[in-house]
Amino acid sequence: MMDSVQIRKYLPHRYPFLLIDRVVELVEGDYILAYKNITINEEVFQGHFPNYPVFPGVMLIEAMAQACGVLGFKTMDKTPDDGSIYLFAGIDNVRFKRQVIPGDRVFFNCKKISDKRGIWKFECVATVDDQLVTSATIMCADRSI
């Protein structure tokens, strides 16, 4: 549904911190399904860990937040070029269940559960090969810049 060129319209992030490769499904105001392909060429593997590359959990959480950002911007029909930014505002109930390694394709499924006064809340899960990797409740804030 959205390739990396279209995703960059809705996220201010750029290489090496753009963590969403493609959006597969998006229903405005409801949910997004996106993914990231993990390759050995990720810069983070130079230090995490050189002899045993594991994609950092914090990067998985950031990727979830970026997917939420795409859903939020698309739902509000806004972009960063409109002077708006979608900030990562909080996280609850984080769980890590499986390591992510080079060669994995991580799917991020994020569902909006509420939005009040510019704060949006999402239930998110990350999976690889239909196995749960990470789950979290993520909050994002729509702000003017």
From Swiss-Prot:
Please give the InterPro entries that the UniProt record associates with this protein: FabA_FabZ, FabZ, HotDog_dom_sf
Please name the GO terms that the record assigns under molecular function.
(3R)-hydroxyacyl-[acyl-carrier-protein] dehydratase activity
Q: Which reaction does it catalyse?
A: a (3R)-hydroxyacyl-[ACP] = a (2E)-enoyl-[ACP] + H2O
Keyword Lipid biosynthesis found: yes
Sorted alphabetically, which keywords does the UniProt record give? Cytoplasm, Lipid A biosynthesis, Lipid biosynthesis, Lipid metabolism, Lyase
Gene Ontology biological process terms in this record: fatty acid biosynthetic process; lipid A biosynthetic process
User: In which domain of life is the source organism classified?
Assistant: Bacteria
Report the subcellular localization: Cytoplasm
Supply the EC number(s). Answer: 4.2.1.59
Listed under GO cellular component are: cytoplasm; membrane
Q: Where is the active site?
A: H48
Tagged with keyword Repeat: no
Report any Pfam family annotated for this entry.
Answer: FabA
Q: What NCBIfam families does the entry give? A: fabZ, PRK00006.1
Q: Which family does it belong to?
A: Belongs to the thioester dehydratase family. FabZ subfamily.
Its biological purpose = Involved in unsaturated fatty acids biosynthesis. Catalyzes the dehydration of short chain beta-hydroxyacyl-ACPs and long chain saturated and unsaturated beta-hydroxyacyl-ACPs.
* Name by which UniProt lists this protein: 3-hydroxyacyl-[acyl-carrier-protein] dehydratase FabZ
Organism equals Saccharophagus degradans (strain 2-40 / ATCC 43961 / DSM 17024)
Q: Which gene encodes it?
A: fabZ
